[in-house]
């Protein structure tokens, strides 16, 4: 009897152990299955993520490619516009730039540059504000800082001509002397841009095209320039930054006072090495012009 009871007890223990082992096996199998499923899902999600990232990279690369194509197309257009003579229609638009067109527009222009101290700051700000300007460059400074001239062109600004020396007695010695000053600077610009076909065809007379001691010489020079297909451009608003103003607030007020209620405004400023106040004022000027509803343009906007 005792042996029977003992055997039954052992059998019971065996059954219990078997049940426990079975439970453990089922549990392990379940855990393994869950982990396998989780691992499979992780791999699936990882693959999906990689595919999504690859698609994003592909789209970004395509977007970048399209932007580069658009940028190159713009550069090619600017090269074409500056590799030929102005049409009669383009000359008329420049000649009558101050004429109202039914909308408010403003041309920011900078003389006497480039300079290594002020011009880069102005270019950085214009790029940030997405504003294109017109730079009337001095030949001597073009030779000194060709990379800045190249940057001006590459970033969509119009590179125009302000003569080579800015010495009135030299520039206005004769009409031929004025033309020589123009040509010397054109050669410097072409060299800076690495483009032998570049022609700005646009000159700003040092001191303006009218008045002063050299007025008669200016008129004679103007006629010779026009005979050679070269237009000139003055201004109808200015910051007076060349007059020694001491604060950026004074510069801004000068622009406001001289532009008045004009619809088409050409603002004279300078980017020579001592005109840091012009840069410091520029952000406020851009904000003011936008508040007044002006659209920013440069000479390219007058060309076909």
Where does each model-flagged region fall?
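Active-site beta->alpha N-cap acidic-glycine motif
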Residues: 77-177, 181-191, 196-201
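Residue-identity detector for glycine
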Residues: 3, 9, 33, 102, ...
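Generic hydrophobic/packing signal
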Residues: 57, 63, 68, 74-78, ...
């Amino acid at each position: 009897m005792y042996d029977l009871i003992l055997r039954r007890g052992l059998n019971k223990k065996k059954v219990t152990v078997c049940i426990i082992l079975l439970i453990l096996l089922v549990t392990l199998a379940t855990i393994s299955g869950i982990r396998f499923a989780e691992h499979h899902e992780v791999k699936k999600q990882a693959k999906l993520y990689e595919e999504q990232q690859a698609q994003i990279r592909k789209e970004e690369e395509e977007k970048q490619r399209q932007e580069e194509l658009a940028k190159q197309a713009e550069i090619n257009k600017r090269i074409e516009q500056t590799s030929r003579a102005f049409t009669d229609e383009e000359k008329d638009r420049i000649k009558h730039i101050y004429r109202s067109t039914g909308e408010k527009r403003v041309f920011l222009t900078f003389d006497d540059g480039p300079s290594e101290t002020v011009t880069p700051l102005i270019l950085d700000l214009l790029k940030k504000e997405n504003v294109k300007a017109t730079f009337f460059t001095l030949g001597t400074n073009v030779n000194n800082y060709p990379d800045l001239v190249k940057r001006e062109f590459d970033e969509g600004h119009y590179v125009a001509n302000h003569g080579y020396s800015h010495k009135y007695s030299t520039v206005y010695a004769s009409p031929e002397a004025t033309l020589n000053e123009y040509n010397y600077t054109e050669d410097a610009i072409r060299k800076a841009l690495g483009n032998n076909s570049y022609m700005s065809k646009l000159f700003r007379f040092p001191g303006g095209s009218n008045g002063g001691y050299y007025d008669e010489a200016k008129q004679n020079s103007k006629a010779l320039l026009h005979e050679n297909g070269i237009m000139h451009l003055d201004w109808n608003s200015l910051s007076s930054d060349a007059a020694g103003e001491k604060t950026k607030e004074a510069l801004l007020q000068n622009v406001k006072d001289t532009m008045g209620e004009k619809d088409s405004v050409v603002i004279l400023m300078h980017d020579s090495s001592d005109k840091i106040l012009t840069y410091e004022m520029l952000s406020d000027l851009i904000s003011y012009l936008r508040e007044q509803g002006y659209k920013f343009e440069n000479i390219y906007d007058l060309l076909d």
